[in-house]
Curated annotation (Swiss-Prot):
It holds the Pfam family zf-C2H2. Gene3D superfamilies: Classic Zinc Finger (3.30.160.60). The keyword Transcription applies. InterPro entries: Krueppel_C2H2_ZnFinger (IPR050826), Znf_C2H2_sf (IPR036236), Znf_C2H2_type (IPR013087). The keyword Nucleotide-binding does not apply. Coiled coil: none annotated. This is Putative zinc finger protein 137. Belongs to the krueppel C2H2-type zinc-finger protein family.
Length: 207
């Protein structure tokens, strides 16, 4: 391939990627960090190790690694975490712009997509329709879960006994059989249950 042509095509690809990211991401900081991939700029430096990084989030995650096995503390809200992964996930709360507001009730979301899904609770819109039975859903995840009823697909497998289930929520509920976890407590008598259905059935004795 001609070198000049290759460079032009590579540059064009970068321009396209930048354009897509500018449309998908409403955070200028994300785009700026992405562009540093090409410039090689690393303006954020770890004071402990001297490592230079291209973005604030990368620096934060790197610094959190120093705290593995210790208590990692968030510099913004002083909340503490036990490991690097959880503190890095938490930090996104501070790093993302909560700028999407529902014009019906005022509830605020960090992502436009979350707002769009939430607004369907007001509009009643259900854009996902299953062709075999005609049932409609407001969320893609609910549609996918229902589809498995028809297809028989069970992608979630229990590591303890090998049982396969249609959804992650069903898997979590099933795993309580093995762990003995009982998350549902009766406020009247203090009795605890592993399943909501058992908890709900128990409640009837108090009424």
């Amino acid at each position: 391939m001609n070198v000049a042509r290759f460079l032009v095509e590579k540059h064009t690809l970068h321009v396209i990627i930048d354009f897509i990211l500018s449309k998908v991401s409403n955070q200028q900081s994300n785009l700026a960090q992405h562009q540093r991939v090409y410039t090689g700029e690393k303006p954020y430096k770890c004071n402990e190790w001297g490592k230079a990084l291209s973005g604030k989030s990368s620096l934060f995650y790197h610094q959190a690694i120093h705290g593995v096995g210790k208590l990692c503390k968030c510099n913004d809200c002083h909340k503490v975490f036990s490991n690097a992964t959880t503190i890095a996930n938490h930090w996104r709360i501070h790093n993302e712009d909560r700028s999407y507001k529902c014009n019906k009730c005022g509830k605020i979301f960090r992502h436009r997509s979350y707002l769009a899904v939430y607004q369907r609770t007001h509009t009643g819109e259900k854009p996902y329709k299953y062709h075999d039975c005609g049932k409609v859903f407001s969320q893609a995840s609910s549609y996918a879960k229902h589809r498995r009823i028809h297809t028989g697909e069970k992608p979630h497998k229990c590591d303890d006994c090998g049982k396969v289930l249609t959804s992650r929520s069903h898997l979590i509920r099933h795993q309580r059989i093995h762990t003995g976890q009982k998350s549902y407590k009766c406020l009247k008598c203090g009795k605890v249950f592993s399943l909501w259905a058992l908890h709900a059935e128990h409640q009837k004795i108090h009424f």
